[in-house]
Amino acid sequence: MGGIKLFHASDLHFNAGYFEYILTLQDKFDIFCFSGDFLYKENAQEKEQVTLWLKSFKKPVFVCSGNHDMPPSWLNSIRGIYADDAIKTINGVKFGCVPYLCDDLLDFAECDILLTHVPPAKTNTSISKNDKDHGDIELARLIKNNLLKAKIILCGHIHEPKSHTDVLNGVKIYNSASNGSKEPFYQVIEL
């Protein structure tokens, strides 16, 4: 991995200001990654506007569905982006887009970077500031047992985690969930 600059955000919840702000950053990044929860309410207007926004990127876009994006078939119907269940290699880096409530995480065992809505359990990225763990137990188990080759997990879901980054068994975890502030929270990952 080398020379790629990733943008990562999650939990934008149909905030038009966030969408506009992120579009102004297009020239600063090579790849854009979003870990779900594009919608605030599940309705046709929100889906249509998010679709147009995602199609407007001139760089590769990887997305996975979140709990607010259900059912996620609308994301998979967007041409020109990599959505749920996609596995794509760019410059030698294999990306995997894990659907919300994924049936088999081992389908993504060979990926270097996983986009998943929910962070691995028992990490500072999955534990909220009120000490509740909302993480994915199976994802954590697979990482701990070296059953996934991922070096990076891009996630969200927890809007105010104890930390936006953590490491589990050598795997770097980035929780980039926005929390409703004026500008979207995002992280820059250099590969």
Walk through the language-model features, giving the residues of each.
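Short amphipathic alpha-helical segments and helix-helix/interface helices
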Residues: F19-L23, K47-K55, L105-L106, D136-N145, ...
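Binuclear metal-dependent phosphoesterase catalytic core
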Residues: G2-G3, K88-G92, D107, A140-N146, ...
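Glycine-rich phosphate-binding loop signature in dinucleotide/nucleotide-binding domains
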Residues: L25-K28, D107-A109, L147-L148
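Cap/insert and terminal regions of metallo-dependent hydrolase folds
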Residues: L39, V50, T123-P161
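Conserved catalytic scaffold of divalent metal-dependent phosphoesterases
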Residues: F62, N67-L142
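Core catalytic region of metal-dependent phosphoesterases/phosphodiesterases
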Residues: A9-I90
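Active-site neighborhood of phospho(di)ester-bond hydrolases with catalytic His/Asp-centered motifs
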Residues: F7-D11, F32-D37, V61-N67, Y82-D84, ...
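A structural preference for long, well-packed, hydrophobic secondary-structure segments
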Residues: G3-K5, H13-Y21, N130-H134, N146
